[in-house]
Amino acid sequence: MKTIKNLILIALLCISVLGCKKTEEALEPSAIDVQYKLPQGNHDYDPALVTLNQKYGTFFLYKWNAVDFASNPVYIAGGFNETYTADIADEAYVGKVLAFVQKNWLNHYSDAFLKANLPFKVLLGQNLRMKASATTNYTILSNYNQITLSNFSADFDAMTDAQKKTYVNNIHTEFFNFIFNRGKLDIPTEFGLVTNYTTAASATTYYSLGYVSYVVALQADKLNKDFLSYIALITSKTKAELDASILKSTTDTGGLIKKKYDIIINYYKTKYNIDLQAIGNAGVIN
């Protein structure tokens, strides 16, 4: 009898436990918090910034902070964050300078190239400078996952034509430097076969060896820096200016500069649908 009572008690306890069990709600994944939200305001230029983000996945920001500017996954003593600083853009000038930047930078490259090579963020700012010397200013700098453009302020209106040309030249040069620093620089194989990088160069022989910069001819990592020096030259000079200088037979005595020039131009036209010489020919588009 005692055994039967115990069995009945156990059964009642089981029923009680089952009756009290709560039904758990289905688990749903939590929403991912996006670091930057666009638009940042309601200016007439904000839709253009949203469109750029949708096309390329890059955040063009006129509101940002010191962490956005200087963050780097690896601390380096005396590195970017300890060397440079900048201020956020004057919002009254963002529309004007953005239009200038689009015409003189982004419009020269294919959408596919920009999507693959633009940084995670482009910071629109002003007073881009060295921390140790406020008078040492820059128009563009890049770091880790960002490019910062300066003169989004009244300084833009104060620029001379020559200064605007330098501004544009620096954008293209730094863009390719950024691509190189990310390990994504695409150098045609044929380009690296023209110059013998083991041959010592001098101030009187570097042109004949196929260099366009004597400084590069003396540095390490010659192939990458040689290619970047060609890019900087091509995108900053008209074809007529190049024909009258480094492509002139009395300068390019070995014909190697012209050979390397042609390799770059044809490669980027064929593979990326980008006419690098057209950038140099365009000069400044206001």
Predicted regions: what they are:
Residues 1-8:
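Bacterial N-terminal signal peptides that target proteins for export
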Residues 21-111, 244, 250-286:
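Acidic/polar, low-complexity intrinsically disordered N-terminal segments immediately downstream
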Residues 87-98, 142, 160-169:
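Solvent-exposed, acidic/flexible segments
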Residues 195-286:
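Metalloprotease/metallohydrolase-associated module, dominated by Zn2+-dependent proteases
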